[in-house]
């Protein structure tokens, strides 16, 4: 008798568990073999930010929402791709370090090596988004789409741009038309090359622009429309980061009237292995500042790249060091860091930045 009761009890427990499992399964989205597989790596930022009011778009806490909630907020994504969300970090992008970006790049390299993965999306804070995007563009050699996306309004705001940006990013990463275009930046319906796209305004939605290079395309109704066939930006190279454990320190110095010429020397004494100058005009640096730079190059073999503090422009080869040509300081910095990590000599670095 007791055996029968125990057996019935076990049966009821199993039945309840099966019902719970069936309910859980009914809430989840079944895998659709007809849809592409897209992996979303979450880094935090405004797109995952929260404020105390739906009217607040300035004072909020970035990196407050996890990847699961971000995906749940955009149900339409499930009709575009099978999504695999991975939380890498969850912070404002001003706090990201080269170590974080190196870790992300290696995770992406492992993911794109999987034959069933069609594309990658990275949700990211906009403050340093272009830096991460540039690093990925220089280190991920794949035809598969890699799309970096962010938002200018927190997730709690009326008219939050994050959900639509994320939906469009997944659409771009799912499209065969996005193949072979390198790392892309997607915000406000515009698709740009990571090599040229930069943040131009700290507040407005239409902040990411590519200036002279122009946008690669736009997204309409979750369909990417490209203006050009896939092309490689002039001067773009790939660096193998498989054996890189730590990136060298490279500092950016800003040019201005009355510049302290000793700042460059101090940066090197504090551990900088290379310098990027956000120079005035094309590549103008103060005379006494150039004397210090010359000494650092000659005595310490420090590579110094001259970029420009202007929003756009060309850094000419009339400077004392290595001109960045069309790369802004923050993009030139990561290229220099990777070159130093890869054992490039100063002459090699000159060739790397030169436009043939």
UniProtKB/Swiss-Prot annotation:
CDD domains: L-asparaginase_II. The active site is at residue 46. It is an enzyme of class 3 (hydrolase). It is found in: Secreted, Cell wall. Coiled coil: none annotated. It holds the Pfam family Asparaginase. Residues 1-22 form the signal peptide. It catalyses: L-asparagine + H2O = L-aspartate + NH4(+). Glycans are attached at residues 37, 52, 176. Its EC number is 3.5.1.1. Substrate binds at residues 93, 126-127. Residues 36-356 form the Asparaginase/glutaminase domain. Belongs to the asparaginase 1 family. This is Probable L-asparaginase 4. It comes from Schizosaccharomyces pombe (strain 972 / ATCC 24843) (Fission yeast).
């Amino acid at each position: 008798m007791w055996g029968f009761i125990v057996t019935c009890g076990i049966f009821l427990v199993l039945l309840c568990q099966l019902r719970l499992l069936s309910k859980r399964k009914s809430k989840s989205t079944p895998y659709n073999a007809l849809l592409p597989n897209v992996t979303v790596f979450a880094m935090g930022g405004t797109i995952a930010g929260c404020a105390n009011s739906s009217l607040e778009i300035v004072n909020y806490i970035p990196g407050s929402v996890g990847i699961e909630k971000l995906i749940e907020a955009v149900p339409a994504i499930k009709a575009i791709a099978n999504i695999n969300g991975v939380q890498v970090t969850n912070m404002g992008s001003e706090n990201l370090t080269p170590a974080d970006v190196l870790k992300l790049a290696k995770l992406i390299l492992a993911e794109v090596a999987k034959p069933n993965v069609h594309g990658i999306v990275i949700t990211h804070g906009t403050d340093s988004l272009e830096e991460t995007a540039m690093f990925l563009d220089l280190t991920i050699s794949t035809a598969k789409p890699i799309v970096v996306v962010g938002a200018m309004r927190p997730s709690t705001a009326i008219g939050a741009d994050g959900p639509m940006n994320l939906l469009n990013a997944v659409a771009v990463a799912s499209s065969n038309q996005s193949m072979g275009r390198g790392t892309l930046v997607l915000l406000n319906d515009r698709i740009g090359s990571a090599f040229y796209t930069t943040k131009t305004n700290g507040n407005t939605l239409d902040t990411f622009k590519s200036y002279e290079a122009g946008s690669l395309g736009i997204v309409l109704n979750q369909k990417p429309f490209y203006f050009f066939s896939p092309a490689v930006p002039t001067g773009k190279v790939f660096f193998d980061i498989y054996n890189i454990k730590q990136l060298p320190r490279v500092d950016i110095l800003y040019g201005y009237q009355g510049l302290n010429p000793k700042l460059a020397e101090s940066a090197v004494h504090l551990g900088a292995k290379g310098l990027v100058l956000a120079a005035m005009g094309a590549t103008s640096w103060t005379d006494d500042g150039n004397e210090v730079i010359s000494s650092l190059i000659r005595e310490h073999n420090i590579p110094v790249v001259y970029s420009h503090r202007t929003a756009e422009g060309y850094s000419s080869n009339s400077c004392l060091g290595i001109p960045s040509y069309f790369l802004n300081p923050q993009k030139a910095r990561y290229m220099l860091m990777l070159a130093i990590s890869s054992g490039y000599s100063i002459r090699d670095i000159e060739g790397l930045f030169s436009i043939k």
